Swiss-Prot record:
Listed Pfam families: CheW (PF01584)
Record's subcellular location: Cytoplasm
SMART domains: CheW
CDD domains registered for this protein in UniProt: CheW
One of the GO BP terms on file: signal transduction
Keywords per UniProt: Chemotaxis, Cytoplasm
Protein's name according to its UniProt entry: Chemotaxis protein CheW
Chief localization: cytoplasm
CheW-like domain boundaries: 10-150
Gene source species: Cereibacter sphaeroides (Rhodobacter sphaeroides)
Gene (name only): cheW
Amino acid sequence: MAAVSLDEDLREVVAFRIGSQEFCIDIRAVREIRSWTPTTILPHAPSYIIGVINLRGSVVPIINLAERLGLGSLEPEARHVIIITVVEGQVVGLLVDAVSDILTLPPSSVQPMPKIASETTLSFVRGVITLDQRMLRLLDLIGVLPNVRRMM
């Protein structure tokens, strides 16, 4: 019997909250999870870019993920966390309320988005994961951050 890679068997995701809504991203895109750090504002940046932080000598843009997803804007507070991700080679921080879990799931647990979803939703969300009484949206970071290379 041939060995099957972990990628084909299981998917690991980092689950997090924005308000009462739950989302997740592929763990392979996550570099680290850190507490809120005040940012330096960038003039004329899109409204969902809070600013930048210095992360061990690298300038990292911080995205207000709630605003980017159309859920209103989070006012950064000490209780919030930043998920540092790598998207197409660019390091980007995502401001969220809290990280709740690291989950290991079979690929079959990801269901497609309903066909009635808007084009924007379809470009941001790769699928829906139902887990007990919870429903998590699996985000497509490339869809959420289409201009990641032009942010800096």
